[in-house]
Amino acid sequence: IWLTALKFLGKNLGKHLAKQQLAKL
């Protein structure tokens, strides 16, 4: 359960950070 939860959070964080990086450009 924890591994899948961490993977899910990791994907969401990746998308969020990617959006922030695109916004800066």
Swiss-Prot record:
GO biological process, alphabetically ordered: defense response to bacterium; killing of cells of another organism
User: Which organism encodes this protein?
Assistant: Lycosa erythrognatha (Wolf spider)
Name of the protein in question: Toxin LyeTx 1
Might you report a single GO cellular component term? extracellular region
Family membership noted in the UniProt record: Belongs to the cationic peptide 04 (cupiennin) family. 05 subfamily.
Where in or outside the cell it occurs: the entry states:
Secreted
Protein keywords: Amidation, Antibiotic, Antimicrobial, Cytolysis, Hemolysis, Secreted, Toxin
Q: What does this protein do?
A: Has antimicrobial activity against Gram-positive bacterium S.aureus (MIC=3.79 uM), Gram-negative bacterium E.coli (MIC=7.81 uM) and yeasts C.krusei (MIC=26.3 uM) and C.neoformans (MIC=13.2 uM). Has hemolytic activity against rabbit erythrocytes. Forms pores in lipid bilayers in vitro; pore formation is reduced when cholesterol is present in the bilayers.
Q: Which residues form a coiled coil?
A: none
Q: In which tissues is it expressed?
A: Expressed by the venom gland.
Tell me one GO molecular function of this protein. toxin activity
Sites where Leucine amide occurs are at L25
Tell me which domain of life the UniProt entry assigns to the organism this sequence originates from: Eukaryota
Answer whether the UniProt record assigns the keyword Secreted to this protein: yes
Broad class of the protein's primary localization: secreted
